[in-house]
C-alpha cells in the first residue's frame, strides 16, 4: 500500500481515532459552558449574538519532520522552501489549513470550535506518522487566538469614546473607519477590539470562549455609555 492509499484509509477511518479527542473536548466544552452560560444569557435578552469566525491553535509532534517527503506523498499539500520553509496542508473535514514546521510544530487555522481544532491537529499528526514512519507524539495543544464579531445594535460615538479612553484607544478616522481598543484589565485577559460607529465590533486575541464572552460583556458595558 502506497502513501496515498494509506492516507485515504486513515481519513476514512479517522472517527475511530477521534474518540479520545472527542471525550477530552466534551469535558473542556462543558467546563467552558458552565463558566460562560451566565454571560451568554445576558446577551440573549439584548438580541445580540457573538459569532466565532476563526480559531487559531497550535500543537507539537515532538519530532523533526522531512517536509519535502510529506509534500510529495499526500494530496492538498504545498511546499515552496524558496518562499517559506513551511509545509501547508488543507483538510476538508474539518475544513482548515495547517502550517507544519520542520521542528514538529503545527499551526492550525480555519476552525470554529476547539473540538474541530483538536481533530484537525490529530489528523495532521496521523498523516505525518503514516508518511514518515516516525513515532509521533501529539502534545502541547492550545488555542492561540479566537476571532469573533458581534453587532451591539447601537450606534457609537467613537470620538467621545476615544477621548475618554485615550489610554486604551487609537482612532484615526481619516486612515481607518474603526476605533482600535486595546483591552487589558489583567496580564491573563487581553484583547484587541475593533469598534465601528454602527455598533459592530470585532474581537481578537482571546484564548478561550469563556474569556471571549468576558471581554465582550465588559466592552458592551462600556459602549452603551456612548450610545449615539
UniProtKB/Swiss-Prot annotation:
| Residue ranges crossing the lipid bilayer per the database entry | none
Q: What is its main location?
A: nucleus
GO BP term, example: DNA-templated transcription initiation
* Organism this protein belongs to: Plasmodium falciparum
Q: Which family does it belong to?
A: Belongs to the TBP family.
Tell me yes or no: is Kinase among this UniProt entry's keywords.
no
Q: Name the gene that codes for it.
A: TBP
User: Any idea where this protein resides?
Assistant: Nucleus
Identify this protein by name: TATA-box-binding protein
Quaternary assembly: Belongs to the TFIID complex together with the TBP-associated factors (TAFs). Binds DNA as monomer.
**Xref: Gene3D superfamilies:** TATA-Binding Protein
Q: Which keywords are on file for this protein?
A: DNA-binding, Nucleus, Repeat, Transcription
- Name where the sequence repeats lie: 52-128, 143-223
Instruction: Name the lineage.
Output: Eukaryota, Sar, Alveolata, Apicomplexa, Aconoidasida
Q: What does this protein do?
A: General transcription factor that functions at the core of the DNA-binding multiprotein factor TFIID. Binding of TFIID to the TATA box is the initial transcriptional step of the pre-initiation complex (PIC), playing a role in the activation of eukaryotic genes transcribed by RNA polymerase II.
Disulfide bonds listed in the record: none
Q: Which PROSITE patterns match?
A: TFIID
Which GO molecular-function terms appear in the entry?
DNA binding
Read off the Pfam families from this record: TBP (PF00352)
- SUPFAM superfamilies to which the protein is assigned, alphabetical: TATA-box binding protein-like
What InterPro entries does this protein's entry cite? TBP, TBP_CS, TBP_dom_sf
**Listed GO cellular component terms?**
nucleus
Amino acid at each position: 500500500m502506497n502513501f496515498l492509499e494509506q492516507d485515504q484509509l486513515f481519513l476514512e477511518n479517522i472517527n475511530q481515532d477521534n474518540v479520545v479527542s472527542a471525550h477530552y473536548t466534551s469535558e473542556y466544552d462543558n467546563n467552558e459552558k458552565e463558566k460562560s452560560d451566565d454571560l451568554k444569557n445576558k446577551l440573549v435578552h439584548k438580541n445580540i449574538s457573538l459569532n466565532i469566525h476563526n480559531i487559531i491553535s497550535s500543537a507539537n509532534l515532538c519530532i523533526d519532520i522531512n517536509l519535502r517527503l510529506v509534500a510529495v506523498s499526500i494530496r492538498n499539500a504545498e511546499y515552496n522552501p524558496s518562499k517559506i520553509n513551511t509545509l501547508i496542508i488543507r483538510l476538508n473535514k474539518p475544513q482548515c489549513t495547517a502550517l507544519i514546521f520542520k521542528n514538529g510544530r503545527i499551526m492550525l487555522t480555519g476552525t470554529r470550535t476547539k473540538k474541530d481544532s483538536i481533530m484537525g491537529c490529530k489528523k495532521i499528526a496521523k498523516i505525518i506518522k503514516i508518511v514518515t514512519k516516525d513515532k509521533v507524539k501529539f502534545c502541547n495543544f492550545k488555542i492561540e487566538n479566537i476571532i469573533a464579531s458581534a453587532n451591539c445594535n447601537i450606534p457609537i460615538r467613537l470620538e467621545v469614546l476615544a477621548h475618554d479612553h485615550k489610554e486604551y484607544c487609537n482612532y484615526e478616522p481619516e486612515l481607518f473607519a474603526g476605533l482600535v481598543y486595546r483591552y487589558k484589565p489583567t496580564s491573563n485577559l487581553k484583547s484587541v477590539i475593533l469598534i465601528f460607529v454602527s455598533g459592530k465590533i470585532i474581537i481578537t486575541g482571546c484564548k478561550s470562549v469563556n474569556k471571549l464572552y468576558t471581554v465582550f460583556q465588559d466592552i458592551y458595558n462600556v459602549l452603551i455609555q456612548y450610545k449615539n
